[in-house]
Amino acid sequence: MSEFLPFSRPAMGVEELAAVKEVLESGWITTGPKNQALEQAFCQLTGNQHAIAVSSATAGMHITLMALEIGKGDEVITPSLTWVSTLNMISLLGATPVMVDVDRDTLMVTPEAIESAITPRTKAIIPVHYAGAPADIDAIRAIGERYGIAVIEDAAHAVGTYYKGRHIGAKGTAIFSFHAIKNITCAEGGLIVTDNENLARLLRMLKFHGLGVDAYDRQTWGRAPQAEVLTPGYKYNLTDINAAIALTQLAKLEHLNTRRREIALQYQQALAALPFQPLSLPAWPHVHAWHLFIIRVNEQRCGISRDALMEALKERGIGTGLHFRAAHTQKYYRERFPTMSLPNTEWNSERICSLPLFPDMTTADADRVITALQQLAGQ
């Protein structure tokens, strides 16, 4: 059998090793100059005014919700077809996640679904830019402005995603992820961009114990060695080791995403003759980052179930992923919201499968996946 082809693999090279070595030799390995450089670079990428690096996108979501004073009695609208960390953060703050359905073919939350879920208790809206494609964020933001509700963009899949000529996160507030499978990675990490100066100031405090400054800031600017606690906060800062890797990856972003697009195109061309259904692309102008390549496996159409397909691919040495099992079908949320019904989400959650997609894949690797799909489709 050929070597196992994983669903994802980080694209690391000598540049990342050199970046880590530089930090280790500098004597400053925790939050410091590399964090500042990463934040500046993301402001340049997105065009937004403020960037706050954090230890994970989940941490970023937590402190953003906290900074907006979301808590008991509040409601936050979000799709169920998302990673559960968003729902968990809402719930842990005592608020109620209001899960809405997605478009059946793009798997993107729609402005109409969001607006229909708004109540007097709605405090925030969290749309997801899914799989590397952008949600219709202008329309969603217009709803937020009309009702006076904060919009927090889940941009975990959207490093390199453009919407109507602007990078995701160009304005408003958006949260990116640098997890190991993301388009750029530093193993674990995240970053918030915002055009709200007061929110940015509060996020910087909340990510580091509620202090007004961090240790590097105190040393650099000669401030008092013991900072003042201004509000209770967390330990969500990113180390310079991680930030240095992320910076190096960011410099390669165009190359990394170009390779993802090439593989996605190879899949698209092959799937035109197969019964497996890829996602539809959004109708609005955009640049897709191709974080994921997802097919839907309808047993009646394909002659095989999704789970059986994933197992058969595994037997052929090919890894796959599932993004995502609907959050409202998870045990905790199923018991909390037993009557919830989201037909498009549920239909897709039972059929979606993420194919291998990462920059170091070769054309032969993609051909191997395609050949396996052809065989499993009886061709």
From Swiss-Prot:
Q: Which GO terms describe its biological process?
A: lipid A biosynthetic process; lipopolysaccharide biosynthetic process; response to antibiotic
Which Gene3D superfamilies does this one have? Aspartate Aminotransferase, domain 1, Type I PLP-dependent aspartate aminotransferase-like (Major domain)
Q: Which residues carry this modification: N6-(pyridoxal phosphate)lysine?
A: 182
GO MF term list: pyridoxal phosphate binding; UDP-4-amino-4-deoxy-L-arabinose aminotransferase
Write down the EC number.
2.6.1.87
Q: Which cofactor does it need?
A: pyridoxal 5'-phosphate
- CC annotations in GO: membrane
Which UniProt keywords are present, listed alphabetically?
A: Aminotransferase, Antibiotic resistance, Lipid A biosynthesis, Lipid biosynthesis, Lipid metabolism, Lipopolysaccharide biosynthesis, Pyridoxal phosphate, Transferase
**Reaction catalysed by this enzyme:** UDP-4-amino-4-deoxy-beta-L-arabinose + 2-oxoglutarate = UDP-beta-L-threo-pentopyranos-4-ulose + L-glutamate
Q: Which InterPro entries match?
A: ArnB_NH2Trfase, DegT/StrS_aminotransferase, PyrdxlP-dep_Trfase, PyrdxlP-dep_Trfase_major, PyrdxlP-dep_Trfase_small
Could you tell me which pathway this protein works in?
A: Nucleotide-sugar biosynthesis; UDP-4-deoxy-4-formamido-beta-L-arabinose biosynthesis; UDP-4-deoxy-4-formamido-beta-L-arabinose from UDP-alpha-D-glucuronate: step 2/3; Bacterial outer membrane biogenesis; lipopolysaccharide biosynthesis
Assembly and interaction partners: Homodimer.
Cite the NCBIfam families for this sequence.
PRK11658.1
Alphabetical list of HAMAP family matching this protein: ArnB_transfer
Q: Which PANTHER family match?
A: TRANSAMINASE, UDP-4-AMINO-4-DEOXY-L-ARABINOSE--OXOGLUTARATE AMINOTRANSFERASE
What is the similarity comment for this entry? Answer: Belongs to the DegT/DnrJ/EryC1 family. ArnB subfamily.
- What's the protein called, per UniProt? UDP-4-amino-4-deoxy-L-arabinose--oxoglutarate aminotransferase
State the organism named in the record. Escherichia coli O17:K52:H18 (strain UMN026 / ExPEC)
| Lineage of source species | Bacteria, Pseudomonadati, Pseudomonadota, Gammaproteobacteria, Enterobacterales
